[in-house]
Amino acid sequence: MAAGTSNYWEDLRKQARQLENELDLKLVSFSKLCTSYSHSSARDGGRDRYSSDTTPLLNGSSQDRMFETMAIEIEQLLARLTGVNDKMAEYTNSAGVPSLNAALMHTLQRHRDILQDYTHEFHKTKANFMAIRERENLMGSVRKDIESYKSGSGVNNRRTELFLKEHDHLRNSDRLIEETISIAMATKENMTSQRGMLKSIHSKMNTLANRFPAVNSLIQRINLRKRRDSLILGGVIGICTILLLLYAFH
């Protein structure tokens, strides 16, 4: 009976790790899609500044389809991983040996933390993509209004020139923001690639921690320091973003 329940637990862990690996790859691709959309936005904005082309950016229909497809796939993987975590929680609640149950709860918490990180990363990347797309739609509408105004009868050239200069100023501000987003995306991708290597190391350290309490205490201190460093890094990125925004709009 014990062997059967142990096999069930290992099977759940195997499913969780497999889904986590799939999500990691999907999120990297999803992030690259958002980054490429942002870069193309800056390039196409410069080329179309004085044109009357109102075609959506980067063949928007295909770009949107790709975005929607990837978002659905990631949401499905997150739902499946949530289900596996729920089954693992049910198993830990039914485990009868206290020492074994504590070790299982530690492992379950680690998988829950990974799920929470992936969910947060997905929603953040999705929100960035939607913001860029909405801004491009707005700028496309502005360009169309400018061209309509220029082509109309009795156009006031001076007013049109001021309008175009203001539009250029907005475009330059957008470019600064997009560069900041690109830097943040590159940093996130680098951290994502390092996370894969740290996973295996962390798993081995957890195994040692379950056997040696002193190692467990050391791991907890390492985790606290890692969270502190993450908060510091996030604060620095936030301050840099605010400074760039202040510089762009003044």
Swiss-Prot record:
Residues 41-51 have a biased composition (Basic and acidic residues). The modification Phosphoserine is found at residue 141. It comes from the Eukaryota. Residues 9-30, 68-95 form a coiled coil. The lineage of its organism: Eukaryota, Metazoa, Chordata, Craniata, Vertebrata. GO terms for cellular component: cis-Golgi network; Golgi medial cisterna; Golgi membrane; Golgi trans cisterna; SNARE complex. The keyword Transmembrane applies. It is a single-pass type IV membrane protein. Belongs to the GOSR1 family. Involved in transport from the ER to the Golgi apparatus as well as in intra-Golgi transport. It belongs to a super-family of proteins called t-SNAREs or soluble NSF (N-ethylmaleimide-sensitive factor) attachment protein receptor. May play a protective role against hydrogen peroxide induced cytotoxicity under glutathione depleted conditions in neuronal cells by regulating the intracellular ROS levels via inhibition of p38 MAPK (MAPK11, MAPK12, MAPK13 and MAPK14). Participates in docking and fusion stage of ER to cis-Golgi transport. Residues 2-229 are cytoplasmic. Its main location: Golgi. GO terms for biological process: endoplasmic reticulum to Golgi vesicle-mediated transport; inter-Golgi cisterna vesicle-mediated transport; intra-Golgi vesicle-mediated transport; protein transport; vesicle fusion. The keyword Transmembrane applies. InterPro entries: Golgi_SNAP_su1. Residues 38-59 are annotated as: Disordered. Component of several multiprotein Golgi SNARE complexes. Identified in a SNARE complex with BET1, STX5 and YKT6, in a SNARE complex with BET1L, STX5 and YKT6, in a SNARE complex with STX5, GOSR2, SEC22B and BET1, and in complex with STX5 and COG3. Interacts with GABARAPL2. GO terms for molecular function: SNAP receptor activity. This is Golgi SNAP receptor complex member 1. The chain crosses the membrane at residues 230-250.
